[in-house]
């Protein structure tokens, strides 16, 4: 029983370090391992981060939204999931909210997010 408590209490900072820092409004590309029968392949899911839930805990999740053939698709990923191969930060967004649920009712130009401009100095 004591060993189980130690395993649950493990801090996963090493596993967190392999992912970039991202927040709501950022455009990311998530590489996920998909196993179909005996085959295993990597599928990419690119979209805007709508929210991060339970930050800095072992149960942290993040929601990514994309538009596929005119239909909005949202997917929730656990940050410490073994199926996530890597996360690429494509673009940083400039937003004032931590949860961007207002994007669910918008399409096209109305759903755009301003890009954060970083200087290369």
Curated annotation (Swiss-Prot):
Q: Which GO terms describe its biological process?
A: translation
* GO molecular function list: structural constituent of ribosome
- Record-level GO cellular component terms: cytosolic large ribosomal subunit
The organism's place on the tree of life at top rank: Bacteria
Pfam families named among the record's database cross-references: Ribosomal_L19
Q: Do the record's keywords include Ribonucleoprotein? A: yes
Q: Does the keyword Ribosomal protein apply?
A: yes
* Keywords tagged on the record: Ribonucleoprotein, Ribosomal protein
Family matches, as PANTHER family: LARGE RIBOSOMAL SUBUNIT PROTEIN BL19M, RIBOSOMAL PROTEIN L19
UniProt similarity note: Belongs to the bacterial ribosomal protein bL19 family.
Q: What does this protein do?
A: This protein is located at the 30S-50S ribosomal subunit interface and may play a role in the structure and function of the aminoacyl-tRNA binding site.
Protein name as annotated: Large ribosomal subunit protein bL19
Question: Source organism lineage?
Answer: Bacteria, Pseudomonadati, Bacteroidota, Cytophagia, Cytophagales
Which gene is the coding source of this polypeptide chain?
rplS
